[in-house]
């Protein structure tokens, strides 16, 4: 790694990323698309949300996946390339499934495991933000099961105030929080929850300026969604180039 690549990197929960931008999990889902990220400038490779069993529910298309047992070998393959760190994203029908999935992906070599608590299916099944005890139990189950850092992705709105969410997640030893890159997400969370976590902002990234702006507002790194879908893996090189140009 050169000094010039290092200066746009990030350290998230002790994991070094060569670049502070990575893919959002919903942007790419097929194995061959994820493999293309290995040689890109992305800071990490984030897998599509995985569930215990194959998920094909017609009302929740955002969670469609072949099941964790098909994705664990992909994690091992990607890790073996020596490319960017690999991040697993998981969703469970109950607290036990979150713990099971966290252990399975951590053991496969992921850099951290992200609990997707933002999907409507999770709100309908686990409902982690209706009772802080549920959120605490879920988070603790994951941090106790996984030997790697745990991240929690928050929904657009939570019934619990962010300060309460901070207390619950910090008590459970969660180290990363993923929030929407907007006023009600990133800015409000940083304002109300402080600096207890490494924050990753997702969405709203179309230029190097957008990345710099998110970092200035308190994010450690960003996840790229629509720009990646439109441009492909080359978007990360463009974002990096634009950030360097802005620095002169």
Regions found by a protein language model. Name each.
Residues 23-26, 154, 202:
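Short His-Asn-centered micro-motif
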Residues 205:
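Short donor-sugar binding/catalytic loops of nucleotide-sugar-dependent glycosyltransferases
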Residues 26, 50, 118-120, 181-182, ...:
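Flexible loop residues that form catalytic
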